[in-house]
């Protein structure tokens, strides 16, 4: 996953809509869904979708008459990528460790339990992904 930036409010609303659908959506479909909650121009939604496509967050599918858009990554994968990118901003391992400690101090009991389970699976060798920042073979 490429380096990510935090999503703006409208980008997040567009992504939330796309994640809630099983089929790729046209600009019109996204516009109609979002316009029910806020006043938006069709061209604004189109621009946001095009920018999300340039960021490789949505896939632009060309149909006969309209473009359809689908998320490239699931919500969980995108959020995890944002967290890894934020952690990578630390200059050294000591700073990364301190950032992790501050993060863990702020999570709730359910999230802490999920972290414990994930770490236990990773230590048991059942993790399905390399640790963040680990080199991968190409």
From Swiss-Prot:
GO molecular function, one term: DNA binding
Annotated region described as Important for dimerization, given as residue ranges: 74-138
KW Nuclease (keyword) present: no
Family classification: Belongs to the BlaI transcriptional regulatory family.
Species this protein is from: Mycobacterium tuberculosis (strain ATCC 25618 / H37Rv)
GO cellular component: cytoplasm
Task performed by this protein: Transcription regulator that binds to an inverted DNA repeat with the consensus sequence 5'-TAC[GT]AC-NNNNN-GT[AC]GTA-3' and regulates genes involved in antibiotic transport, detoxification and cell wall function. Also regulates its own transcription. Binds DNA as a dimer.
Localization: Cytoplasm
Protein name: Transcriptional regulator BlaI
Key words, A-Z: Antibiotic resistance, Cytoplasm, DNA-binding, Repressor, Transcription, Transcription regulation
Main location: cytoplasm
Subunit and interaction comment: Homodimer.
DNA-binding region: 6-71
Other comments on record: Was identified as a high-confidence drug target.
Expression triggers: Autoregulated. Up-regulated by amoxicillin.
GO terms, biological process: negative regulation of DNA-templated transcription; regulation of DNA-templated transcription; response to antibiotic
Chain positions of site Cleavage: 102-103
Disulfide bonds: none
Modification comment: Upon exposure to beta-lactams, proteolytic cleavage at a single site may impair dimerization and abolish repressor activity.
